[in-house]
């Protein structure tokens, strides 16, 4: 009799373009486990700096390894020319994340090609991308909108993280490096928030089939992560997650929700119920809510809540207007070294300091600035730490 096999979901994360490759590097630095990393770029020099498991240099004949020049058509053609290589790299994956910074050339044009290949191979395909800062120019913003639409049609689920929201979370002294690093942090959290649900065993477990049930063919999705300590910590963490200023829209009306609550061994049934009830109230009355808990004593008295909301109607999630940085009352981005962005943006909040729950988050949309930044390196995607 053959010994039992240990079947695990095969998850691959593909970073394409300058922003996508930077995002992958950040995930590797933060120790994201249980996934295989693939970096794809037309910029051969930038690709050399990647720490990914696999690197693919595309468009060598058309770009000579010098990048796409912020032209999505060049990026699309480069990815299509390498279709066979990309297909070989993605074969066997159960789930594929495609991450990129929208608005440039390689990521904007190539991400839909990668997503289409992954979906054709039968993998659950999730896009996690950033919308550019307004100061990056109107041309880049328009290219990003077109790229986001193309990617939405090519993958099962798409999470869009608007960089302009980071300005509302920062102070006037925030550096350019800090701003882009914090964007990478958000991308990291988008990928880690989903993979952790699958790869981390829980007391109430969420497996790959649960995730696939919510995200397969779901279209636009929203992701929020919150953490808190002290009295009412689980409820406050849930409030932070569903009202995150980094969400592009309100989760109201979501038909499918993935909810994970992580905490120490003292995590109580009553506080779990409070957090789950709050999320349930924010979603559609008939929503399919997949719930899981993880006991992790290394969290101490911190409770961490991850919410992925998907399955909106044809109109999609309701967008909200951008709030000016001066009007936003949120936690500041560290203005010193970029490494401090993680702690300032995603540090657990003392429960007593969290504002009362409100309906939905405000969204940030790409901007209308006049200037143009044509360098692919600028589309640095956001990542998050656990």
Swiss-Prot record:
Locations listed in the record: Cytoplasm
UniProt GO molecular function: GTP binding; GTPase activity
Alphabetized Pfam families for the sequence: FtsZ_C, Tubulin
Entry keywords, A to Z: Cell cycle, Cell division, Cytoplasm, GTP-binding, Nucleotide-binding, Septation
Domain of life: Bacteria
Family affiliation: Belongs to the FtsZ family.
Chain's role: Essential cell division protein that forms a contractile ring structure (Z ring) at the future cell division site. The regulation of the ring assembly controls the timing and the location of cell division. One of the functions of the FtsZ ring is to recruit other cell division proteins to the septum to produce a new cell wall between the dividing cells. Binds GTP and shows GTPase activity.
Protein's name according to its UniProt entry: Cell division protein FtsZ
